Protein backbone atom coordinates (compact mmCIF):
# COMPACT_ATOMS: atom_id res chain seq x y z
CA UNK A 1 0.00 0.00 0.00
CA UNK A 2 1.40 3.42 -0.82
CA UNK A 3 0.34 6.99 -0.34
CA UNK A 4 1.53 9.85 -2.50
CA UNK A 5 2.50 12.97 -0.58
CA UNK A 6 4.08 16.33 -1.14
CA UNK A 7 3.66 20.04 -0.89
CA UNK A 8 1.05 20.10 -3.66
CA UNK A 9 -1.43 18.51 -1.23
CA UNK A 10 -2.04 21.92 0.38
CA UNK A 11 -3.53 24.91 -1.44
CA UNK A 12 -1.75 28.24 -0.95
CA UNK A 13 -1.91 31.74 -2.28
CA UNK A 14 0.02 32.41 -5.50
CA UNK A 15 3.73 31.70 -5.22
CA UNK A 16 6.14 34.60 -5.02
CA UNK A 17 9.16 34.64 -7.30
CA UNK A 18 11.93 32.28 -6.18
CA UNK A 19 14.21 34.16 -3.84
CA UNK A 20 11.48 36.53 -2.60
CA UNK A 21 11.11 36.71 1.18
CA UNK A 22 7.97 35.22 2.74
CA UNK A 23 6.69 36.00 6.23
CA UNK A 24 3.31 34.71 7.44
CA UNK A 25 1.60 33.33 10.50
CA UNK A 26 1.52 29.53 10.73
CA UNK A 27 -2.11 29.76 11.82
CA UNK A 28 -2.93 31.19 8.38
CA UNK A 29 -1.94 27.88 6.76
CA UNK A 30 -4.64 25.18 6.64
CA UNK A 31 -4.06 21.98 8.59
CA UNK A 32 -4.76 18.87 6.49
CA UNK A 33 -5.49 15.36 7.75
CA UNK A 34 -2.72 12.78 7.26
CA UNK A 35 -4.66 10.11 5.30
CA UNK A 36 -2.85 7.09 6.79
CA UNK A 37 -2.69 8.52 10.33
CA UNK A 38 -4.96 8.46 13.38
CA UNK A 39 -5.82 11.92 14.73
CA UNK A 40 -2.88 13.29 12.72
CA UNK A 41 -2.67 16.45 10.63
CA UNK A 42 0.00 18.40 8.75
CA UNK A 43 0.62 21.93 7.51
CA UNK A 44 3.05 22.86 4.74
CA UNK A 45 4.40 26.08 6.23
CA UNK A 46 6.92 26.84 3.46
CA UNK A 47 7.80 25.04 0.25
CA UNK A 48 7.96 25.47 -3.50
CA UNK A 49 4.50 27.07 -3.59
CA UNK A 50 5.96 29.90 -1.50
CA UNK A 51 9.12 30.16 -3.62
CA UNK A 52 11.41 28.02 -1.42
CA UNK A 53 13.51 26.08 -3.94
CA UNK A 54 15.35 23.55 -1.75
CA UNK A 55 13.35 22.50 1.32
CA UNK A 56 9.79 22.01 2.57
CA UNK A 57 9.02 23.11 6.14
CA UNK A 58 6.06 21.23 7.65
CA UNK A 59 4.34 21.13 11.04
CA UNK A 60 2.65 17.93 12.21
CA UNK A 61 0.10 17.68 15.01
CA UNK A 62 -1.22 14.45 16.54
CA UNK A 63 -3.84 14.31 19.25
CA UNK A 64 -3.88 11.97 22.25
CA UNK A 65 -4.24 8.39 20.95
CA UNK A 66 -3.02 9.46 17.52
CA UNK A 67 -0.13 8.29 15.42
CA UNK A 68 1.17 7.34 12.01
CA UNK A 69 1.86 3.67 11.15
CA UNK A 70 5.25 2.34 10.07
CA UNK A 71 6.25 3.67 6.68
CA UNK A 72 9.21 4.72 4.57
CA UNK A 73 9.84 7.84 2.51
CA UNK A 74 12.21 8.48 -0.39
CA UNK A 75 13.58 11.63 1.28
CA UNK A 76 15.32 12.23 4.60
CA UNK A 77 13.52 13.94 7.50
CA UNK A 78 14.92 16.39 10.05
CA UNK A 79 12.51 16.92 12.94
CA UNK A 80 12.23 19.14 16.01
CA UNK A 81 9.64 18.38 18.71
CA UNK A 82 7.62 21.42 19.84
CA UNK A 83 5.30 19.87 22.46
CA UNK A 84 3.80 16.64 23.76
CA UNK A 85 5.46 13.24 23.96
CA UNK A 86 5.56 10.33 21.52
CA UNK A 87 7.06 6.92 21.01
CA UNK A 88 8.84 6.96 17.66
CA UNK A 89 10.19 3.75 16.19
CA UNK A 90 13.02 4.24 13.70
CA UNK A 91 14.49 1.16 11.99
CA UNK A 92 13.18 -1.02 14.83
CA UNK A 93 14.65 1.13 17.66
CA UNK A 94 12.07 2.72 19.97
CA UNK A 95 12.64 6.29 21.19
CA UNK A 96 10.49 8.34 23.56
CA UNK A 97 10.72 12.00 22.55
CA UNK A 98 9.45 15.30 23.91
CA UNK A 99 9.92 19.06 23.60
CA UNK A 100 13.29 20.21 22.23
CA UNK A 101 14.31 16.73 21.03
CA UNK A 102 15.65 16.48 17.49
CA UNK A 103 15.53 13.53 15.08
CA UNK A 104 17.18 12.62 11.80
CA UNK A 105 15.45 9.89 9.78
CA UNK A 106 17.44 8.80 6.70
CA UNK A 107 15.63 8.25 3.40
CA UNK A 108 14.17 4.75 3.08
CA UNK A 109 14.21 4.10 6.85
CA UNK A 110 11.02 2.61 8.38
CA UNK A 111 9.54 4.84 11.09
CA UNK A 112 6.27 5.27 13.01
CA UNK A 113 4.72 7.59 15.60
CA UNK A 114 2.54 6.81 18.64
CA UNK A 115 1.41 9.69 20.86
CA UNK A 116 2.08 9.22 24.58
CA UNK A 117 1.00 12.70 25.68
CA UNK A 118 -0.96 14.86 23.29
CA UNK A 119 -1.16 17.01 21.53
CA UNK A 120 2.19 16.05 20.02
CA UNK A 121 3.62 18.62 17.59
CA UNK A 122 6.84 18.71 15.62
CA UNK A 123 8.48 20.56 12.77
CA UNK A 124 9.67 18.37 9.88
CA UNK A 125 12.04 19.62 7.18
CA UNK A 126 12.43 17.56 4.00
CA UNK A 127 14.22 18.20 0.71
CA UNK A 128 12.09 19.63 -2.08
CA UNK A 129 12.28 16.41 -4.10
CA UNK A 130 9.88 13.71 -5.27
CA UNK A 131 8.73 11.56 -2.35
CA UNK A 132 6.56 8.51 -2.03
CA UNK A 133 5.31 7.23 1.31
CA UNK A 134 5.12 3.45 1.51
CA UNK A 135 3.42 1.71 4.43
CA UNK A 136 5.46 -1.07 6.00
CA UNK A 137 3.47 -4.25 6.53
CA UNK A 138 3.42 -5.64 10.07
CA UNK A 139 5.77 -8.57 10.60
CA UNK A 140 8.07 -7.69 7.70
Give the predicted meaning of each segment.
Residues 1-54, 137-140:
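A short, N-terminal "cap"/entry segment at the start of jelly-roll beta-barrel domains
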Residues 58-73, 107:
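Conserved short histidine dyad/triad with adjacent acidic residue
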Residues 59, 104, 118-134:
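A short hydrophobic beta-strand segment most commonly corresponding to one strand
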Residues 60, 85, 93-95:
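Well-ordered beta-strand scaffold positions
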Residues 69-70, 88-89, 105, 111-117:
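Short beta-strand His + acidic residue motifs that chelate non-heme Fe in jelly-roll/DSBH
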Residues 74, 93, 109-110, 118-119, ...:
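A generic "binding-loop/recognition-motif" signal
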Residues 75-86:
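Glycine- and acidic-residue-biased ligand/ion/polar-headgroup-sensing regions
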Residues 92-107:
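Short acidic-glycine-tyrosine-enriched beta hairpin
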Amino acid sequence: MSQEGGSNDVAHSPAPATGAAVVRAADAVPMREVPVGRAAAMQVLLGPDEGAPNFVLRRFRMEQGGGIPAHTNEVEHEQYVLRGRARITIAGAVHEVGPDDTLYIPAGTPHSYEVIEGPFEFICVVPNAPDRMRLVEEGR
